[in-house]
Structures are given as structure tokens and as C-alpha cells.
Amino acid sequence: IDYFKPSNGTVEKKITITQSARNAIRIPLCGTTRTYADSAIGLSLLTNYIKKWNGKCRLGTLTDGGAGVVVHGMNDCAYKQAWSEFAANLKELRANGNKIASVCMTRSGYHCVVFGRNSWRGNIPAAMKKDLLQYERNNEQIYCVSISENGRYLIITDRHLTGSDTNVIAVLEKAGKMYGHLKYACVTNLGVVVVCKKGIYYHNIPTTLEMAMKSL
């Protein structure tokens, strides 16, 4: 996902937040933010589907042009302007009863869907493909994949935390140390968000995204 663009004169800040939700469950949030110009558009179709599912969206991926995919339940999908190959893969997986584990898509043409334990399909960076093939051969369970518009990527399995560069890997490792088992993560051209068992850690994300997470 990459739906924010940096504005001139951005200033980084660090903040630690503890949120108290309506049900009194406290979700620790910690990380760094920057001031971004939010250019996300055209998300009404996807949000309408999420409303039809009573807010129960399990997975999702968005681009800065408003294209994206949301997943409900095992493999129920709704998408807007998804790449034809990506859409065909999603339809086939649903028809075959495969459980979708992770999805990602970019405006620049990258896309990937992980299903079952470690099967996957998509158009992805060469280095990422090499990593996924190795994890598939090792029979590792692939939990999550993410790709940014400029080709940064991350992979989370039951044995490895992999990223396209040392900065991405460092964020994943720090998140695990702070909040335990990593469940999902998203990498953009500039930032990373990691959802762990006991909290959420983020690096260099838009202040607007931080505010949205605080409001959950």
C-alpha cells in the first residue's frame, strides 16, 4: 500500500500512545510519524462493502489511485480496478475454496496473493520471488506479504522476517521485541506499520494514519 505523498517541509516526530477503546481493551501504539499530504481517493466502493460485512474486513490493500482489494471471511473479496491477472487469481481461489492469507497490490503493477500454507501467485520484485520460492520449498507458513510502489517489500513467515532493505528488517525486528508475535505488516515507499500480538509499531507513517489508528 502506498497512498500518501510527502509534502514540502516535512518534520518527523516521535510519539507513544496508549489507546482505550470502547470495550476497555488497551492497544499500545508506538512509532514515528511525518507530515504527509493525503492523496487517497475513491475508496467509497470498498468501504461500502466493508459496511455490508458489518465492518468485518479481515485483509485489505489500497493504492494511491483508489484501487484496492478487501477480503472478508475465508476468501470473499471485493475489489476496485484490480489488475486483471490479480482479479482472475482471486476469483479462482474463491471458486476453489482456498483461504486467502495475504494480499497486496500497487498502482505500478505489483500484486501478490498468498493462500493456504505457503502458496502464492503474482507479479512481484525478483528478490521477493526468490525469497518466497525458498520459503515454499522449506514448507514455512507465510503469514503476510507487502510491496510498495517503488519495490520495497516485506515477508513474514513462521520462521523468518524478511525485507527488501535493512531498514525494513530493523522495523520488523523492533516491533517483535516490543509487542511480541508479528501478525501483519505493511510497507510503503517511506514507512512501515507492523501489527503484533500485543500492540502496533510504526515507522515514518503519515500523522493522519496515526490519528486514524488512535480513533479505532
Q: What spans do the regions from the language model cover?
A:
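Trp/Gly-enriched beta-strand/coil motifs that build multi-repeat beta-propeller-like domains
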Residues: 2-216
